[in-house]
Every structure is written in structure tokens, then in C-alpha cells.
Curated annotation (Swiss-Prot):
Coiled coil: none annotated. This is DNA replication and repair protein RecF. The RecF protein is involved in DNA metabolism; it is required for DNA replication and normal SOS inducibility. RecF binds preferentially to single-stranded, linear DNA. It also seems to bind ATP. GO terms for cellular component: cytoplasm. The keyword Mitochondrion does not apply. The keyword Cytoplasm applies. Belongs to the RecF family. Keywords: ATP-binding, Cytoplasm, DNA damage, DNA repair, DNA replication, DNA-binding, Nucleotide-binding, SOS response. The lineage of its organism: Bacteria, Bacillati, Bacillota, Bacilli, Bacillales. GO terms for biological process: DNA replication; DNA synthesis involved in DNA repair; double-strand break repair; SOS response.
Amino acid sequence: MKLKTLQLQNYRNYESISLNCHPDVNILIGENAQGKTNLLESIYTLALAKSHRTSNDKELIRFDSDYAKIEGDLSYRYGEMPLTMYITKKGKQVKINHLEQSRLTQYIGHLNVVLFAPEDLNIVKGSPQIRRRFIDMELGQISAVYLNDLSQYQRILKQKNNYLKQLQYGQKTDSTMLEVLNQQFAEYALKITLRREHFINELESLAKPIHSGITNERETLSLNYLPSIKLENKDKSETERLEEVLTILNDNMEREKDRGVCLYGPHRDDLGFNVNGMDAQTYGSQGQQRTTALSIKLAEIELMNIEVGEYPILLLDDVLSELDDSRQSHLLSTIQHKVQTFVTTTSVDGIEHEIMKNAKLYRINQGEIIK
């Protein structure tokens, strides 16, 4: 898939711009705080109907405006389609081919993106929340079913946590409701756990050879899914696995009542990375951690193509300067002539690669594109 054009109205520091995008590499050059990252963010927001930088949509609206609008014309192997997102101070509206979508699960997945920013280099050494978010962002784009299951799970999790707090403070004494919530909770927890497990296995199979290539076969990468609810026997039927999840939840019900919070479930999952059999988070050097992050991102691109039949759009937000020449070269060689890419940078000096010959450059200054 390719983004042919991008139009912004009243988005962040952009009053009104229209961008004709290059099908290969688009480089956004400018000093800091001019709007380069805002433009990249708008593409991400158009894809996922939310920003990766803020949970408050109002911040996306230009300071003197009542609304913001993002519109992109996309080309696929099978045709073309516009996507539109309106953001007001009361909410947001998304459209596919000019038709409003009542549910975000119907919308997400029509524009797939992979974001690689400096903070993504922390996927190895950062918090479990960062790794869970990475999993959910990938799976949510390639599987509407997963996105719906995750939404239902989060709804039930919120209900369960509220009820546990009420029990803790003596506002409720009937545990029957908790048993009902546990049944619903277990069903979605199992679906999410199994889908994440499959995803991690697929991602590992792609990341291993990539990591080996970057390190000239000196290192071997392995991924380790660390579910909060550990299922012992993988040969059991889904019904038996559901009973296993319920048993774990029921066995720990008193602990959860005492703590007033849900202690088990996919919201507490984690993902481990091993390099040459050693935990990369604890023992990996900064170089190994960065190579691991790069390998995972490149594997993410390939997996998305396998799952949906289209390469995603790659957003590189000031990350090339964070990579040494070898890793930078490997990244650019991998995406060349294959993945439409948007790059933000303060300068193209130091980007020595053939890919630059066909790149389209845009100079960004105070929310405007300077021709």
C-alpha cells in the first residue's frame, strides 16, 4: 500500500497543507519544533485513529481552531481509496471512501503503518507496557478480530477492577458478580493469549534471520512470550484451556479481593528477548539492544506483508541518527524499492545510501512546506 496524497487542516501547527507523496522515500527536513514529527504523527493517527504521542485528541487541533482534519488517498494492489479523520473537541469521526464508520474496528487496518522512533529503541530495556503496546499495535492492524477481543477484554477488566475496589472497601459483599465477570474475563483472556503466542512465534521466525544478518551471524536472537496466565499443556482443547484459565482466576480470587485489583491476565503479559541465550534486557549491551529493536521492526514489516498481502508504510521519526552506519545501511537496504517510507531528520548529511538518489525531499518550516 502507498499513501499518494496527504491533506491536513488545522492539525497541530499546520493550518492547511497538501502533500503529494513519493511512492518510495519521503524525507522531511527541518530544524527542531518546526512540525516534522507532527506530519509523521498525522499519518500514524490516520492509520490507527489515535496518536502515539498523546491520549488527548484535543491536543491535535490547532490552537485557534475548533476541528482538525486528516485525509489521505491510498493506493493498493486492488485499487484506490480515501481515508478521512475529523477531530473535534467533542470526539472524532472516521470515514472509508467517504462513508462514516460507526466502529473503529471496522476502520483500523485499511492503512497499516510501522513507526520507528528513538523511544522504540527502548522496546528491549523499557517497561512491559511498551512491549504490550507494540504487540497490540501490530496485531490490531492485521486482525480486526483481535482488536475487537482486546476492546472487550479491556472493558471487562475495567468492570472487574471497579468491582474488586468496591469489595475491598466493603461497598459490595456479593461475589457472584465477580464469578460472572471472571467467566467473561477468562474467555477473552484466552483468545488474546493464544493470538499473542502465535504472533510472537511468527515474529521470531522472521526476526531471527534478520538479526543474524545484521550481526554477520555472530548473534542469535530468540523471543520469549511471557503470559501472565501460563497454560501448561498446549495439547489441550480450547474448552479445557478455558477451564484452566478459570481455575487460575478462581484460585487467586481472594488475593485479588485483598489487593482490590486484577492480578492476572493479558494486561500483565510481557515479552522477553534473548541474544545468544542471554537476557538482552539485563545483560545485553546498548548495541545488542538496538540491533534487537531494529530486527523486530524489520520483522514487523515483513509479517504485516505476509498477513495482509501489502507492505505497510514505514515512519522513521529521527531514528536514523540514532543508528550507526552499519545498522542504518541494513535498514535502508531492506526497505529499498519495497516499503514506502517517511523520514524526519534535521539534515541528510551522514545518510550515505543509494536510496537517497530517488528520495523526495520536503523542507518543513513553522508548519509549512517550503518548495
